[in-house]
Amino acid sequence: MKRFLLCSFTLILLYPAGIDMYLVGLPRIAADLNASEAQLHIAFSVYLAGMATAMLFAGKIADRSGRKPVAIVGAIVFMMASLLCSQATEGSLFLSGRFLQGVGAGSCYVVAFAILRDTLDERRRAKVLSLLNGITCIVPVLAPVLGHLIMLRFPWQSLFYTMSAMGIIVCLLSLFILRETRPARLAPRDLSRSSHAAESLINRFFLSRLAITTLSVSVILTFVNASPVLLMEVMEFSRGDYAITMALTAGVSMVVSFSTPFALGLFKPRTLMLVSQGLFLTAGVTLSLAHTNTVTLFGLMLICAGFPVGFGVAMSQALGPFSLRAGVASSTLGIAQVCGSSLWIWLAAILGISALNMLIGILIGCSIVSMLLILSVAPNRSISEHEEIHNQSRP
């Protein structure tokens, strides 16, 4: 079991590392490529576009050909794309590398969730996803620090050499440590009609959890996107104060994430999901009424506490009905989360909504819609029939 957890963690880790590690070198990258920082900020959107593109096909391939081949190919693509970014001499080549990085990270991300679905029951899966969420919260804090230390002695290309090395490590783990978890009884070229019917993506429960997780990811990405403007322009924080504040928010997320597995032993998953949305609603109201920086910061901390309480549980429930199509289900969730959150941020920017109101709007909207879905769409008894765990992994 440890091998599956180790491999799943490293597969997921490529996604946040690809976002956060290079940011500290952005000014030097822009100078060397004769591009403005504003032009290179689109690299974030290009990276997410690459992830969404990979998710369109990675899940289905993983269900038909296996988790291991997709993980290996994804890691190789991430590694090669990182090298391409390091050798870029102009902006378009750099953005091409970022897109391919997203393709590699997206493929690995989908496989990681499929592996967890294959090997863990719902309660253990929810606990592990909460722990993984806590660990990945460390990356946005540590990655820029590591990047800064690297750039004290080496050029910005070393940031991408480091990411390439991460891709090599993930590839080696996938090649020699990871065992295939795809159900042995799943035919490689076709699925029976009865299996498709039993595990259809078009069912109320899955769609409700897809909506909840998409809205929750939209909240956290809106927070990340709006935080520089909100903290440094509206609240007039210095860069140092901003860094400290973001480290504190990451710390809150980590503490709550590591506490959630223990809470799952005391409370029902539905209770934790309602608590999560209650914290989002409280945060939205707090931010809308805040007149001081202290109250605003309290509202931001509530966001970082609310997300890890319910996200892992909701993801676990969403994957629960899919014994044979975990890859497709994982892809669908990933695409919805990436595209849904990007669409909200884009629409808010087009409409000229301020950073604070953008955050308040998604907090209140997410909490109300999610609470209604949690209360009105409960897991069906038939879902438990499909909660099959495929521990008999093959080499």
From Swiss-Prot:
Top-level division of the source organism's lineage: Bacteria
Key words of the record: Cell inner membrane, Cell membrane, Membrane, Transmembrane, Transmembrane helix, Transport
Transmembrane regions: 4-24, 42-62, 69-89, 93-113, 131-151, 158-178, 212-232, 247-267, 271-291, 295-315, 328-350, 355-377
SUPFAM superfamilies on file: MFS general substrate transporter
One term of GO molecular function: transmembrane transporter activity
Cellular-component GO terms for this entry: plasma membrane
Localization: Cell inner membrane
Lipid bilayer topology: Multi-pass membrane protein
Family, as annotated: Belongs to the major facilitator superfamily. DHA1 family. MdtL (TC 2.A.1.2.22) subfamily.
HAMAP family recorded: MFS_MdtL
Protein name: Multidrug resistance protein MdtL
Species the sequence originates in: Salmonella arizonae (strain ATCC BAA-731 / CDC346-86 / RSK2980)
Lineage, top ranks: Bacteria, Pseudomonadati, Pseudomonadota, Gammaproteobacteria, Enterobacterales
